[in-house]
C-alpha cells in the first residue's frame, strides 16, 4: 500500500460531483492507475457510469439481507467496472430512519479488513457535502481521505457548501493528515463564475484545480450510463476531464490547510462580484418598479 493516494470528492447535492469524480477516475485509469471507488452518498450513484449499470447493491442493503456485515464476502459488494476500476457503494438507511453516515463507517471498515485497499494506487471517496455530519465526515475524521477535492459552481449554495466543507477539513487537519487538494468548478454559466471560483479558492488558501466547461455531451453519456471518457473519448469534454485528472495526479502532497471564511465574508464577496444585491439596491429596484407601474396606470 506504499504510495496509496486516498482522495475524496465532496460537494453539495446536484452539483455534478459523482459525474465529475467518475470522469476524472476514468481518465486516471487510462494513465495506468489502479483505482477503488467507495461511494458514500445515500443515492448510491457514485459508480453507475463506471459500471455502465443501474445503481449497484450497497454494503448496507446486502448486509441487511445476509444478517450482518460479517456475513458478507468481498466479492458480493465489490464490482469491477471500466478498465478494471473496483466499485463499492456504502449506501444508507431508508429516508428518515437512522444515520446514513453509519453506512460509510461500516463499509470502510469492512473493505479495509477484507483487503479491498490492497494493490490499488487510488482510493476515491465520493461524499455528499451538504451536511458535514459525523458519518459523512468519516473519511476526513478517520484520516482515510488525505486529499479533498470540492466540486462547486458559481451558485451561492454551492459556494456556501464549499466553505462549509472547508470548515470540516480544518477541524481535522491538525489531528490527522487531511488537506484540501483544491476546488473543481463545474460551470453553471452564472455571472463571473471563473473569477468567483478563483477568488474563493484563494480565500480558502487553496487553488482552483480545474474549471470544467458545461457541455451537453455529459448528459448524452449519462443517459447511456457511461462517462464521457468512454462514450466520446475524442470529444473536447473528454479532453477537459483528462486535464483535470492530470492536475489531480500531479497534485500529490500539495494540499493545504484551508482558511474558511464567515457567512458575512462570503456574502460580501458575492456583493463585490455583483452576484448578490444589497438591501438598498433591492429596495431601490422595487421602488423603481412600483413607480413604473404607477406611471403606467395613470396613462
From Swiss-Prot:
GO terms for molecular function: 4 iron, 4 sulfur cluster binding; ATP binding; metal ion binding; nitrogenase activity. Keywords: 4Fe-4S, ADP-ribosylation, ATP-binding, Iron, Iron-sulfur, Metal-binding, Nitrogen fixation, Nucleotide-binding, Oxidoreductase. Its cofactor is [4Fe-4S] cluster. Disulfide bonds: none annotated. ATP binds at residues 11-18. It is an enzyme of class 1 (oxidoreductase). SUPFAM superfamilies: P-loop containing nucleoside triphosphate hydrolases (SSF52540). The keyword Transmembrane does not apply. Its EC number is 1.18.6.1. It holds the Pfam family Fer4_NifH. The reversible ADP-ribosylation of Arg-102 inactivates the nitrogenase reductase and regulates nitrogenase activity. [4Fe-4S] cluster binds at residues 99, 133. It catalyses: N2 + 8 reduced [2Fe-2S]-[ferredoxin] + 16 ATP + 16 H2O = H2 + 8 oxidized [2Fe-2S]-[ferredoxin] + 2 NH4(+) + 16 ADP + 16 phosphate + 6 H(+). PROSITE patterns: NIFH_FRXC_1, NIFH_FRXC_2, NIFH_FRXC_3. The modification ADP-ribosylarginine is found at residue 102. Binds 1 [4Fe-4S] cluster per dimer. CDD domains: NifH (cd02040). The keyword Iron applies. InterPro entries: NifH/chlL_CS, NifH/frxC, Nitrogenase_Fe_NifH, P-loop_NTPase. Coiled coil: none annotated. GO terms for biological process: nitrogen fixation. The key enzymatic reactions in nitrogen fixation are catalyzed by the nitrogenase complex, which has 2 components: the iron protein and the molybdenum-iron protein. Homodimer. Belongs to the NifH/BchL/ChlL family. This is Nitrogenase iron protein.
Amino acid at each position: 500500500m506504499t504510495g496509496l493516494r486516498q482522495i475524496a470528492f465532496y460537494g453539495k447535492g446536484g452539483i455534478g460531483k459523482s459525474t465529475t469524480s467518475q470522469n476524472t477516475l476514468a481518465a486516471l485509469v487510462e494513465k495506468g492507475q489502479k483505482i477503488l471507488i467507495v461511494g458514500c452518498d445515500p443515492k448510491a450513484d457514485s459508480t453507475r457510469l463506471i459500471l455502465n449499470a443501474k445503481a449497484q447493491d450497497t454494503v448496507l442493503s446486502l448486509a441487511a439481507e445476509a444478517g450482518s456485515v460479517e456475513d458478507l464476502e468481498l466479492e458480493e459488494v465489490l464490482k469491477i467496472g471500466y478498465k478494471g476500476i473496483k466499485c463499492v457503494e456504502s449506501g444508507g438507511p431508508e429516508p428518515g430512519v437512522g444515520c446514513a453516515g453509519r453506512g460509510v463507517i461500516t463499509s470502510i471498515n469492512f473493505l479495509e479488513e477484507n483487503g479491498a485497499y490492497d494493490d490499488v494506487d487510488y482510493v476515491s471517496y465520493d461524499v455528499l457535502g451538504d451536511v458535514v455530519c459525523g458519518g459523512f465526515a468519516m473519511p476526513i475524521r478517520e484520516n482515510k481521505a488525505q486529499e479533498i477535492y470540492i466540486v462547486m459552481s458559481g451558485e451561492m449554495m454551492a459556494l456556501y457548501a464549499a466553505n462549509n466543507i472547508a470548515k470540516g477539513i480544518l477541524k481535522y487537519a491538525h489531528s490527522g493528515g487531511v488537506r484540501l487538494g483544491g476546488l473543481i468548478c463545474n460551470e453553471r454559466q452564472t455571472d463571473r463564475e471563473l473569477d468567483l471560483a478563483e477568488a474563493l479558492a484563494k480565500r480558502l488558501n487553496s487553488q482552483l484545480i480545474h474549471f470544467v466547461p458545461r457541455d451537453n455531451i455529459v448528459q448524452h453519456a449519462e443517459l447511456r450510463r457511461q462517462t464521457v471518457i468512454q462514450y466520446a473519448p475524442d470529444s473536447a469534454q473528454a479532453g477537459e476531464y483528462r486535464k483535470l485528472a492530470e492536475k489531480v495526479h500531479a497534485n500529490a502532497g500539495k494540499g493545504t490547510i484551508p482558511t474558511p471564511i464567515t457567512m458575512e465574508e462570503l456574502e460580501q464577496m458575492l456583493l463585490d462580484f455583483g452576484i448578490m444585491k444589497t438591501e438598498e439596491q433591492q429596495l431601490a429596484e422595487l421602488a423603481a418598479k412600483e413607480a413604473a407601474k404607477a406611471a403606467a396606470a395613470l396613462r
